[in-house]
Curated annotation (Swiss-Prot):
This is Telethonin. The modification Phosphoserine is found at S39. The gene is Tcap. InterPro entries: Telethonin, Titin-like_dom_sf. Residues 157-167 have a biased composition (Polar residues). Residues 142-167 are annotated as: Disordered. It comes from Mus musculus. Keywords: Cytoplasm, Phosphoprotein.
Length: 167
């Protein structure tokens, strides 16, 4: 199966705003595949000859960064599919305007970043309402050390206990 690929690169730079954008994606894939239901097989038992031929087709897959995918067979038209939106990196980077500012003066964390942080903590198994061990032990009743019992004192005399055992 032969395959050819075409990649695209786009880069943009804005010197005034000090911004840059760069993207690369695999745009077009053309592959030769055996065509289903298009094969020929002949066998001549007298001459001990066989002939086999498999039909081939060129499959086309075209992707775009706008979440559109086109699939089909070369020469027969392509079927277009709109892919579902998926959040991918890079996320917009948040930097506070005043690094040394107090908590009230700072800007709020962007919603996308808050959602990502919440997802990471949920997937990481971290508990939001986490308490230290010292705080948990403060809520417990105090631990009373177990005292060792002394030697057991007999309440019955030896002769009475032997009689009780005999029945």
């Amino acid at each position: 199966m032969a395959t050819s690929e075409l990649s695209c690169q786009v880069s943009e730079e804005n010197q005034e705003r000090r911004e840059a954008f760069w993207a690369e994606w695999k745009d077009l894939t053309l592959s030769t595949r055996p065509e289903e239901g298009c094969s020929l097989h002949e066998e001549d038992t007298q001459r001990h000859e066989t002939y086999h031929r498999q039909g081939q087709c060129q499959a086309v897959v075209q992707r775009s960064p706008w979440l559109v995918m086109r699939l089909g067979i070369l020469g027969r038209g392509l079927q277009e599919y709109q892919l579902p939106y998926q959040r991918v990196l890079p996320l917009p980077i948040f930097t506070p305007t005043k690094v040394g500012a107090s908590k009230e003066e700072r800007e709020e964390t962007p919603i996308q970043l808050r959602e990502l942080l919440a997802l990471e903590t949920a997937l990481g198994g971290q508990c939001v309402e986490r308490q230290d061990v010292a705080e948990i032990t403060k809520q417990l009743p105090p631990v009373v050390p177990v005292s060792k019992p002394g030697p057991l004192r007999r309440t019955l005399s030896r002769s009475m206990s032997q009689e009780a055992q005999r029945g």
